[in-house]
Amino acid sequence: MQFAYFTYFIFLLVLGGILYYGRDWKGYWSVMTYSAIGYGLGYVIAMFFPVQSPWFSMAGMWHGELVGGPLTALVNLIEKCGRVHGAAFPSQHVAGAVAALWGAWRHRRRLFWVFLPFVLCMCVSTVYVRNHYVADVIGGMVTGTLGYVIGVWLMRKQEAVAARA
């Protein structure tokens, strides 16, 4: 499940890479815009709703650390040494993955169907590995979707993509 949680950044990298190397500049910059807006909205919301993750707020209720392979051990170490208090809502991992998922829907429909089960698994794993509450995941889905909707609106403006790589 830790691996599923860690996959949030892969979706944007894969989709962005395919669009970039396919020289689909409008698609590439659109997807980057969806993600940037989704992340930006999420950070603003987190400032107004500083929610601690279950990792801290429910720490006494667990029956021990999560058990798994080397990735789980690495994550447990990171959690102990560098975890941020008060930035659980909305889940930025989910927001970024959902924004990329919407980008795949709009620009590479087949990739959307490849991403979908992995994004759903990542959403479940965010709760399972104690990083977020279900409300954080729903908030991340809404934030990522808003990033997409606002990004589509912005990219429809003439000359929204003037850069060429």
Q: Which residue stretches match the model-derived regions?
A:
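Membrane-interfacial catalytic/cofactor-binding modules of polytopic membrane enzymes
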Residues: 44-107
